[in-house]
Amino acid sequence: KIKERSHYCILRLAGLIGPNRHPVKFLLKQETRENGAAVVNLIHQKDVIQAIVSCISQEKNQAIYNVCYPEHPTRAEYYNEAAKFYFQQEMTFNSGEKGKIILGKKIEKERKFKYSNKITDFGDLI
């Protein structure tokens, strides 16, 4: 019964990426890759930690936040770039549906939170 408490902060996280955690490793193993036109909704684990710290340090009443990096390339664009960066391989996708963009702006407005780890900075992710 969390909603009965006077203070709570619920973080709804996008797909998590970080050191030793990148979905491109699993996608490379698949023969068929679906929904290349769908956007990615990802968040770096360092930004998740900062979001948690902002919730703990700035007490607000009853808040629920989506935590998702504000850039949303397509799956085909994003994972193909990652595959080239890490493995010097090209990936192909079936186009499929576009999907939903998850917006994580509310936490930026209400808690002075900043997304500081770009999902396209591949250097430390594998």
Describe the function of each predicted region.
Residues 1-19:
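Conserved beta-loop-beta element that borders a ligand/cofactor-binding pocket
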Residues 9, 41, 100:
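Residues that recognize and position ribonucleotide moieties
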Residues 19-26, 77:
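Short beta-loop-alpha junction of Rossmann-like oxidoreductase domains
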Residues 24-32, 37-65:
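Alpha-helical substrate-binding/gating segment
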Residues 45, 75, 112-116:
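Amphipathic alpha-helical segment in the mid-to-C-terminal domain
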Residues 49-104:
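Mid/C-terminal beta-alpha module of Rossmann-like enzyme folds, strongest
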Residues 119-126:
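Amphipathic terminal alpha-helices
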